[in-house]
Amino acid sequence: MELHIWPSDFGLPTIDVSSLQFLACSKMCASPVRVVQSARPWRSPNGELPMVAQIDGNAKPVTDFEKFVDILKKCGQDVVIDADLTTIERAQLDAFSCYLHHNLYPAVLHTFWADDLNYNTVTQYWYASHLHFPYNLYYLEKRKKKALRMLGGKNDTEILKDAFMALNTLSTKLGDNKFFCGNKPTSLDALVFGYLAPLLRVPLPNDRLQVQLSACPNLVRFVETVSSIYLPLSEDELKRQQSNRKMWQSRISKAKADKEAAKTTEEAAEAIPDEPPMRDAILFTIGALVLSVAFAIHTGLIQVSVEEEIAE
């Protein structure tokens, strides 16, 4: 079985939310899946990564997380994901997964795909540099439109409010535990890790959601725990990512500087006093009177007679 995911960066084995969820889940149950870092989403049935290709047999590639979890449960490895959960715990896991999809995932989409500053500075540049031209233009446009459709026209304030509440709910549920269902990871842990890790690790000029996440130390600890135990990077990956760090720092710094400059310009424009309203009203009144008189004379409503004086 092969798991095709987007390449690694920013201290993560992959920066894509779904790819992280698939990878984390496979590692948590020690599945002998072969991981393939790929930048060829067109090979997937839905044109997206991750994709699970089953080498033996003619089974179709899998791109759905729940179906992948079912496959892992039947693979026969010693550690079976979610095996120790009771019926009630499984129902709670499903409910929580649905809650996160509707309240946290939209904010993740907005952060990386709908926020123009983040998109232009990080998302667009990263994907464009990993995909060949002109396919990168097509893919980015398609992915961005898909994200906007999923957001459904929600405003930024509403999206962030739901996400902040979801993060607080996650923090409360985790508490002092190592994982969300005790001391053993479940598919919920893989799901949550996929949402949180990019928010925590990828540098962004608009970082409101990152700041909120960083204010939940147990969630930060959770991400670091999963990363160190199940998803450590190789020396080659660390060196490659280190070589790109200065470039990303430069891009983020420039984006933040441009953002502050634009804010300063906007504030300066707002500080310029408007023309006195009384003067405008007087000028408007005079102009209206002149036009009214001219119109009346032109249409004959007002007649002007000129009498010539007869010389004696």
UniProtKB/Swiss-Prot annotation:
Transmembrane segments: 282-302
Family: Belongs to the metaxin family.
Entries under InterPro entries matching the protein: Glutathione-S-Trfase_C-like, Glutathione-S-Trfase_C_sf, Metaxin1/3, Metaxin_GST, Mito_Protein_Transport_Metaxin, Sam37/metaxin_N
Protein name: Metaxin-1 homolog
Source organism of the structure: Caenorhabditis briggsae
Known function: Involved in transport of proteins into the mitochondrion. Essential for embryonic development.
Gene Ontology BP terms: mitochondrion organization; protein transport
Keywords: Membrane, Mitochondrion, Mitochondrion outer membrane, Protein transport, Transmembrane, Transmembrane helix, Transport
Gene3D superfamilies, alphabetized: 1.20.1050.10
Subunit composition and interactions: Associates with the mitochondrial contact site and cristae organizing system (MICOS) complex (also known as MINOS or MitOS complex).
Domain of life: Eukaryota
Cellular component terms (Gene Ontology): cytoplasm; SAM complex
Subcellular location: Mitochondrion outer membrane
